Design a protein with these regions (language model features):
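Internal helical hairpin/lid segments
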Residues: 200-258
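ATP/NTP phosphate-donor binding region
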Residues: 1-82
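ATP/nucleoside-binding phosphotransfer catalytic cores, i.e., glycine-rich phosphate-binding loops
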Residues: 241-329
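N-terminal glycine-rich "phosphate-gripper" loop used for MgATP/nucleotide binding
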Residues: 85-96, 117
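A short helix->loop->beta-strand "cap" motif at the edges of active sites that frequently abuts
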Residues: 11, 82, 107-113, 131-133, ...
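Short internal beta-strands
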Residues: 52-54, 116, 234-241, 274-276
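Conserved anion/nucleotide-ligand pocket segment
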Residues: 132-194
Length: 329
């Protein structure tokens, strides 16, 4: 009798770099090799095999190589047949340059779960707009150089199952809504309006985040989504981290804060708005699904999300008993 031999492989996490690289110094002239090595070492400690795409250690200006090299790196990540998860090294700027250069049908055929954030929200959008493929918004690879139990627990829990559950604190009005759960970086979303890579989603629940944008600019971007007919076609808006939004809000009668901006948007869009979700450019960011059906409810102080059909990798380190020396146990 012939005994069947099963090959067991360790889960593979592919790191790619469609935008900027981490740099050192005020002149941004040197590649921060140490931070990249540190993040990959921590990912390996969590049980991943880590593979870099060919452009990850390249540097042209502040980018991870030329536009062609970065596009090839992104395609390489999606073409890797053993990939379980794709993380981007960091955000910054430059991903949108690559959108016409990627074969999105090939990318959509990948079994890997793509995780975007910040500038790489452009990839989430293009994947869904062209192929309908679900993905994630969550931490960039470089974030893992620093231990953060809350971030890591959220990341691991999210990827475990095709059904996603979340209960989190927010502020705003009570509502119940069902629809496609999607979103990401507000500046990137608005920059894609009118392009082939912007998702056409009606009756969705849109979540947004940003960093270093004052309240008036946040309002202006949300107003663009209203006037483009995007926000008014959603059932609710969830606002995540807006780090630095009130830094230049001013004082006294002339003060204009994020809460002022969101109150105006709520009136104009005529949809419920919840704010304060721990998601975005935050050390303990949540990981959220992109492009999946969901049921969302808020009582004004807490938000409950159940999402279905999420991108759950076939192989994850924490699905099996982890080695005893892993730092999060």
């Amino acid at each position: 009798m012939t005994e069947e031999v099963k090959t067991v492989r360790d889960p593979l996490l592919v790191v790619t770099a469609p935008a900027r690289v981490p740099t050192l110094g005020e002149d941004f002239a040197a590649y921060d090799t140490a931070s990249v090595d540190a993040c990959e070492a921590q990912l390996r400690r969590r049980g991943w095999r880590v593979k870099e795409t060919a452009n990850v250690r390249l540097m042209e200006h502040r980018f991870a190589g030329s536009d062609a090299a970065r596009a090839a790196g992104l395609q390489e990540a999606f073409d890797e047949v053993d990939a379980d998860v794709i993380l981007c090294l960091r955000g910054g700027y430059g991903t949108a340059r690559l959108l016409p250069k990627v074969d999105w049908e090939r990318a959509g055929a990948s079994c890997a779960a793509f995780v975007g954030l910040s500038d790489t929200t452009a990839v989430n959008c293009a994947l869904y707009a062209v192929t309908g493929k679900a993905s994630w918004q969550g931490p960039v690879a470089r974030a893992f150089r620093l231990v953060n139990p809350a971030r890591d627990a959220a990341f691991e829990a999210a990827l475990m199952s095709e059904t996603f559950h979340l209960k989190a604190s927010v502020t705003g009005e009570a509502f119940n809504a069902s629809g496609i759960f999607w979103g990401g970086n507000l500046a990137i979303l608005t920059s894609l309006v009118g392009t082939p890579w912007f998702p056409k989603i009606d009756g969705g629940i849109l979540y947004v985040e940003d960093v270093a944008e004052p309240a008036w600019r946040i309002e202006r971007m949300l107003l663009q989504l209203i006037q483009a007919g995007v926000l008014t076609r959603q059932r609710a808006l969830i606002v995540g981290g807006m780090t630095g939004a009130d830094k230049t809000a001013g004082e006294g009668a002339g003060r204009f804060s994020l809460s002022d901006a969101l109150a105006w948007i709520r009136r104009e869009a005529k949809i419920p708005v919840a704010s304060g979700l721990r998601f975005g450019h935050l050390a303990d960011t949540l990981t959220l699904p992109f492009g999946v059906e969901s049921d969302v409810a808020s009582d004004g102080s807490s938000l409950t999300v159940t999402a279905y059909g999420c991108a759950s990798p076939a192989s994850l380190p924490w699905r099996e008993a982890p080695p005893a020396d892993l730092w999060w146990h």
